[in-house]
């Protein structure tokens, strides 16, 4: 879980305010699998040359079933999944815009959606060079101003522990009751594999295919992890300072936004806004491009118009990005907080992730396996709240219980479907072995990556234990 996104400050503030430091295992659990992509999958993606990650499906799954999955995933991921991810970032910046311009949350959502549409135009027609580096610099400057302003407030050093003095039970890194222990076990035992993008497929796949060698692919995956590790301490540290300040906001996620603009000097507020805006665009643009490429290249060009010109591709991509932006705005009107949204996404992902990982070495898995996992995981996730009170897990938190039940049910569904559908493993093995080399090499690298992730998880937890108790 990387910390350079517009919504992270709000999300983490909400988690710590509601659950205390033990709630951070929801985020920290991602360290277990964070090295899997750069050490295991990035070198594999570098060996292949695909315009979209969806094209891997035609390579991995032969026959009509592979083609059907290829089409379905382009629409499902390009429409539904990308919209949810866009919605997450859109809500984060809309809250900032609402407070800065003193407008309603509804108007801020419409304003932010309009901005996304404008940047979709810039994306497609290449009006100027990508500004990711400038956006990152602006964000770091903004973060530095926020931290400096908080640290120079009167009594700020004491404010670091003010929140824990008022809520001593929230200082502990470990759960204090049965329900929170259950949540911790779910985070570490199941949810960790849904915190990242499974096997590196998605918008980041193109970063791995663009490098020249395996070393470059690994470094491309490792650099964001190192940056994330360092920034995480700054993020949580300044959030603890913010939680120590008095605030009238009922929603702790809004507490972060209001406090930031209260503590920084008036002259610096436009810089803060620009920093948040730059990071919002940097994270939203790749998602829009990913969704548009899936629809334009895999659906339209792959089915209806193989000879699509570059100009026509741009028009369709632009239209798709506009549609995704507007759809994200509509979704955002019905979402109350970022925690509920990300837990919904993690629940859907937890049921699907095993297929994405195992498909590289278990050649019996076919297109129907992945299709059934995607459908059942989404359906079970959406239906679960209606049945929670009738199940054995009814005494435990609903969202964590949902992850367990959805993962178990989805796994049963796709394994049964795998065994009942045609075995194409002979043909698949011929395609995959030159890429994977051998199952033993894959398993060895995967094991090393997991062990390294567990070590980093221990370092993070131990570091915060020492910081909070010394």
What are these regions (language model features)?
Residues 1-470:
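Membrane-embedded helix-loop-helix hairpins and adjacent transmembrane boundary segments
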